[in-house]
Amino acid sequence: MHFLIPAAGSGSRMKAGKNKLLIDLEGESLIYWTLKSVFSASSTNWVGIIGQPKDKNLLLNSTKDFAHKVHWINGGDTRQQSVFNGLKALPKDAEKVLIHDGARCLINPELIDLCAKQLDENEAVILATKVTDTIKIVDNEGFIKETPDRNYLWAAQTPQGFLVDRLKKAHKMAIDKNWNVTDDASLFEMLNWKVKIIEGTYSNIKITSPIDLKIAKLFVKNP
């Protein structure tokens, strides 16, 4: 399985003053923990890290023994552009790809393998968890408009897996139509292409704030 990891997080909400994937988690960088999980998955055979050139040396150095196993890909101005750069950098024989947020460093390798396996039967899959909170849709003035049925609500995670040719086509169409999305599954939705949900775990959090880092430390100490 080919694997792409967007790794351009600025760390502004973490107040880190550097790429957040360089932040320490129990003695190792976040990107190190992410790669440890990715390479622990039996389906992984090629990994590309997509980041900004200024971060290249620091990120690769922080991955330690994994540095010689990954391929560096220069990112774009947005996550969407960066993923498209990653798709163009894949080996010509790549048929399937998993895309995973670099800041989701607690991903279970077995879930990675499950996503890879599900691509044998689906052209697009994503990890997600059932929403347990009551969600409110509000208007521009902050008043509640409606409460959607949470039985139909899922919180999207990564990895998100796709057939490479299909995802490339979706990205090219997004460029032509000037679409801007926050994840790749959204492109498939806009094109009315099916995306299969695979139930993930609540531990697969994205590190975006100091409280997330504290939670991640608990999971690392108590796997």
Curated annotation (Swiss-Prot):
UniProt keyword annotations, A-Z: Isoprene biosynthesis, Nucleotidyltransferase, Transferase
Gene3D superfamilies: Spore Coat Polysaccharide Biosynthesis Protein SpsA, Chain A (3.90.550.10)
Record site: Positions MEP for the nucleophilic attack: 150, 206
UniProt KW tRNA-binding keyword: no
Top-level class of the enzyme under EC nomenclature: transferase
Nucleotidyltransferase is among the record's keywords: yes
Site keyed Transition state stabilizer: positions: 13, 20
Coiled-coil blocks: none
GO terms for MF: 2-C-methyl-D-erythritol 4-phosphate cytidylyltransferase activity
EC number: 2.7.7.60
Catalytic activity: 2-C-methyl-D-erythritol 4-phosphate + CTP + H(+) = 4-CDP-2-C-methyl-D-erythritol + diphosphate
Metabolic or biological pathway, per its Swiss-Prot or TrEMBL entry: Isoprenoid biosynthesis; isopentenyl diphosphate biosynthesis via DXP pathway; isopentenyl diphosphate from 1-deoxy-D-xylulose 5-phosphate: step 2/6
GO biological process: isopentenyl diphosphate biosynthetic process, methylerythritol 4-phosphate pathway
Superkingdom of origin organism: Bacteria
Matching CDD domains: CDP-ME_synthetase (cd02516)
Stated family: Belongs to the IspD/TarI cytidylyltransferase family. IspD subfamily.
PANTHER family according to UniProt: 2-C-METHYL-D-ERYTHRITOL 4-PHOSPHATE CYTIDYLYLTRANSFERASE, CHLOROPLASTIC (PTHR32125:SF4)
Function, in words: Catalyzes the formation of 4-diphosphocytidyl-2-C-methyl-D-erythritol from CTP and 2-C-methyl-D-erythritol 4-phosphate (MEP).
Protein name: 2-C-methyl-D-erythritol 4-phosphate cytidylyltransferase
UniProt source species: Prochlorococcus marinus (strain MIT 9301)
Protein encoded by which gene: ispD
